Amino acid sequence: MLRRGETGLAGAPTHVQADRMFEIDPAFSATSQALGDLALSHARLQADARFPWIVLIPRRVGARELEDLAAGERDVLMDEVLRAGAAARAVAEALGRPAAKLNIGQLGNITPQLHVHVIARRPDDAAWPAPVWGFGVAEAYAPAAQAAAEAAARRALGL
């Protein structure tokens, strides 16, 4: 685990630190679909058809806050957030609901594992202008929409 003030690992990110394997919190597995791994983060599509929503989970054991990442890793994460923004916009386009605004948040109040939400929003979406967290009940994607959303997100992320 990286501790505050440490420089982190040199070179490519790894799934293993301090003899422990990186694992995704079960809450993410229950509420989202895996898209694939970027240089630092595991990318997922949130399972809520109301909002084109990408979640990035940096593959760092024990990371809970941005400050738990080395400076270079934070730079990589910011690049991945921008790519996730393009992916959320691509999902919105694929679903016929172009995005007007991106919401980006790193909360962790409920699921403490470090993660970043990137959500494409529109003035006519179910929660606008309020935050999407805790708004109503998630709506499952129809199978064709799920496939289109995943394909659009993966293309935009380069996966």
Predicted regions and their residues:
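HIT superfamily nucleotide-processing domains
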Residues: 16-159
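N-terminal amphipathic/basic-hydrophobic helices that include classical n-h-c signal peptides
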Residues: 1-19
